[in-house]
C-alpha cells in the first residue's frame, strides 16, 4: 500500500481514483498531478515504481495544500469570521446556514434535531 501525504491509498485502483482518497485532492487536481508527473491515466497504484510514487509525493507537497494543513486553514478561516463578528461569522457561531438558505421550515441538518416546545400540543 502506497502512503502519500499521510494517507494509505488503495493499491488496486487507478492512480487518478486513488489520489482522491487524500483530503483536498479531487478529480481535477488528481488528473493535473498525474499529467504533471507523466503517468498514464490507466495505470494502477500497484504498477507504480517507488520513484514514481516519490514524484507524486513531491508534486503534491510542492503545489497543493492537503490533509491537516487544509483542514487547519479552513477552520482558521471560520474562526476568523467568527472573531470579526461579521454576518457569516454570526451564522457560524449560531450553527445556522451561512449562505442565505431559508430556516423557517428547513435547515434541520445544520440546526440539529428538532427541539420540543412546551404548550405546542393540539
Curated annotation (Swiss-Prot):
Entry's Gene Ontology molecular function annotations: rRNA binding; structural constituent of ribosome; tRNA binding
Domain of life: Bacteria
Annotated stretches, region: Disordered: 97-122
Transmembrane segments: none
Assigned GO CC terms: cytosol; small ribosomal subunit
Keywords: Ribonucleoprotein, Ribosomal protein, RNA-binding, rRNA-binding, tRNA-binding
Pfam families membership: Ribosomal_S13 (PF00416)
InterPro entries: Rbsml_uS13_C, Ribosomal_uS13, Ribosomal_uS13-like_H2TH, Ribosomal_uS13_bac-type, Ribosomal_uS13_CS
GO BP terms in the entry: translation
HAMAP family per record: Ribosomal_uS13
Purpose of the protein: Located at the top of the head of the 30S subunit, it contacts several helices of the 16S rRNA. In the 70S ribosome it contacts the 23S rRNA (bridge B1a) and protein L5 of the 50S subunit (bridge B1b), connecting the 2 subunits; these bridges are implicated in subunit movement. Contacts the tRNAs in the A and P-sites.
Family, as annotated: Belongs to the universal ribosomal protein uS13 family.
Assembly description: Part of the 30S ribosomal subunit. Forms a loose heterodimer with protein S19. Forms two bridges to the 50S subunit in the 70S ribosome.
Official protein name in the record: Small ribosomal subunit protein uS13
Organism: Brucella anthropi (strain ATCC 49188 / DSM 6882 / CCUG 24695 / JCM 21032 / LMG 3331 / NBRC 15819 / NCTC 12168 / Alc 37) (Ochrobactrum anthropi)
Gene: rpsM
Amino acid at each position: 500500500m502506497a502512503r502519500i501525504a499521510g494517507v494509505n491509498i488503495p493499491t488496486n485502483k487507478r492512480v487518478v481514483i486513488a489520489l482522491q482518497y487524500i483530503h483536498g485532492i479531487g478529480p481535477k487536481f488528481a488528473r493535473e498531478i498525474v499529467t504533471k508527473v507523466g503517468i498514464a491515466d490507466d495505470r494502477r497504484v500497484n504498477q507504480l515504481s517507488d520513484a514514481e510514487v516519490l514524484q507524486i509525493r513531491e508534486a503534491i507537497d510542492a503545489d497543493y495544500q492537503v490533509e491537516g494543513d487544509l483542514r487547519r486553514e479552513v477552520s482558521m478561516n471560520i474562526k476568523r469570521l467568527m472573531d470579526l463578528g461579521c454576518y457569516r461569522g454570526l451564522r457560524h457561531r449560531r450553527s445556522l446556514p451561512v449562505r442565505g438558505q431559508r430556516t423557517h421550515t428547513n435547515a434541520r441538518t445544520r440546526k440539529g434535531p428538532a427541539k420540543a416546545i412546551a404548550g405546542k400540543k393540539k
